[in-house]
Amino acid sequence: MSFAGLLDFARKDVDLPQNSPNELLKDLHANFINQYEKNKNSYHYIMAEHLRVSGIYWCVNAMDLSKQLERMSTEEIVNYVLGCRNTDGGYGPAPGHDSHLLHTLCAVQTLIIFNSIEKADADTISEYVKGLQQEDGSFCGDLSGEVDTRFTLCSLATCHLLGRLSTLNIDSAVRFLMRCYNTDGGFGTRPGSESHSGQIYCCVGALAIAGRLDEIDRDRTAEWLAFRQCDSGGLNGRPEKLPDVCYSWWVLASLAILGRLNFIDSDAMKKFIYACQDDETGGFADRPGDCADPFHTVFGIAALSLFGDDTLESVDPIFCMTKRCLGDKQVEMYY
Amino acid sequence: MSDSDIPSSTLYKDNVDWKDITPIYPSKEEEVAVKIAVTEDFTDAFAYFRAILIKNEKSDRVMALLEDCIRLNPANYTVWQYRRVCLTELGWDLKKEMRYLSDIIQESPKNYQVWHHRRFIVETIGESAVNDELHFCSEVIRDENKNYHAWQHRQWVVRTFKVPLEKELTFALHMLLLDNRNNSAYNYRYFLMTLYDKTEDASQLDIEINLAKKFIENIPNNESAWNYLAGLLITNGVTSNSDVVSFVEDLYETTPEEKRSPFLLAFIADMMLENIENQKSAEESAGRAKKLYKDLQSIDPVRVNYYRHQSLLAQTMLIKAQTKVTAK
């Protein structure tokens, strides 16, 4: 037997510590989100100015999913988000910063969560988004010209949520997405790029919004996603990478959109997500024992909600928002 | 370094060279809406950055300020964007900028903005930057062999400047020899085939199939190698190459039952599904597929639901095939 053969079954994974939490510490998480401003340094990076509107969405959404939205100060947050709007119609991460699709979507999502979307101008926002669509159907995130399938999801989601999907050239957007579709069933950031769970979520979500999921071989994509589950129960983003709570969301949401959520061992998955909770401060980390932050907290909670946790609001797999706040903006899906 | 070597303050607000600028600190409303704790040098540098943006100043001292801002927050795209504007307008030494970028990337290789900036510089320098650029990608990839940005950047360089196929195939092979499970390297080989129109080229396909077989023989429990093999056969199906079929069957026969990899079993099961679809010993193939999925449920229990679904699929396909035959 070759040396490599000895390592035959050595897949990359983590061990769950024995004393890990084994249930959802919901109240602790609400406190964690609510009090993050008092906890200096450890995660200030996540709320730093350059991605603050996204940070607001993560926090607000985590609270909405936890049925604790009333603990957030609606008026202040809505006014702050509105203040991030630029004259080009898009939203920046903070007042005075350039517009970017990532933050434009997060601004729209936050306003919808607070039932204040009428305060935004749907026409100028959708025109801004339209302006970033390229001739090949792809989208740039901002004027710097970086193309990524993430921005396709941002664009389609933003315009869908505003009831302006027809502003965009959907056919060419779908053609570009399909150029990023790989032989293993996954999607990458651009044509030729490696399959990655996060990008699959973006592409599958965008195809669902466009009503074009039939373009792909769902079983092939779902199979690749099913193989993301490690023996610890956690999900990884690519073969031979470590599991991480945020991939729980991206993989599970993709499978939910494809109607194949049952491919995952939900008990093992929940055990992994529970173990990533910090039972002192609240919040979720990427893996057991690491430092908690709002980003992994919202995706940990959202992933648990997909499995139908009664203590949580039901989450929409495409938009990562409560079905309650989306109402008739949910996308109808046929399997 | 002793204390006396450190200036009493490194803040811009205490620096005489910046006396002419009035810093712009975040407003009260901003602070209240999302309270955020940042360090003093962060607040200081960005207050001057805001002021510079409004003043629209482009100068050497601004370049230094931007470097500070990038150090404090390399993911801030507004800073990078402004740096590009300054570079162009100041006629900045681009080789120097490349060296600076290499350092930043070594520190935070996962940052989107840095790579995007690098692409802008390479585009501006043109052809003469290619060799250094490939070398730089190799270094980052050697450090972290699945670095998504570095592989993607290399694709861009190769596509933009038409780097010869052979050279790049060799690089990917080298990376695969160092780690047979490196999915990024398999993906890169497929990218090269697509770029040079080789995905339907019989001799290139043979080379790739043989490579996949070699790596599977070496480590059978290697998801990436199996996926690569299946991907190469995507046009005509996993049973379309008799050489592959006998390789897989031999591997199954010669491997003791308890050592058979789930990927091996799943691949054969896929072959069986294809046989059912092609009405090739449909009933026998369905029986074997179901047996394989049953074995998979015990050796890879975390995917038990998936294998159950596949088993049901085999049955469904069989009934479809049988009713088709009857309808004739």
UniProtKB/Swiss-Prot annotation, chain A:
Organism: Caenorhabditis elegans
Pfam families with a match to the protein in the record: Prenyltrans
InterPro entries: PGGT1B-like, Prenyltrans, Ptb1, Terpenoid_cyclase/PrenylTrfase
Complexes and interactors: Heterodimer of an alpha and a beta subunit.
Function: Catalyzes the transfer of a geranyl-geranyl moiety from geranyl-geranyl pyrophosphate to both cysteines in Rab proteins with an -XXCC, -XCXC and -CCXX C-terminal.
GO cellular component labels: Rab-protein geranylgeranyltransferase complex
Lineage of the organism: Eukaryota, Metazoa, Ecdysozoa, Nematoda, Chromadorea
Swiss-Prot/TrEMBL cofactor(s): Zn(2+)
Amino acids binding geranylgeranyl diphosphate: 196-198, 238-250
PFTB repeats: 74-115, 122-163, 170-211, 218-259, 266-312
Name of protein: Probable geranylgeranyl transferase type-2 subunit beta
BP-aspect Gene Ontology terms: endoplasmic reticulum to Golgi vesicle-mediated transport; PERK-mediated unfolded protein response; protein geranylgeranylation
Protein family according to the UniProt entry: Belongs to the protein prenyltransferase subunit beta family.
Residues given in the record as Zn(2+) binding sites: D244, C246, H296
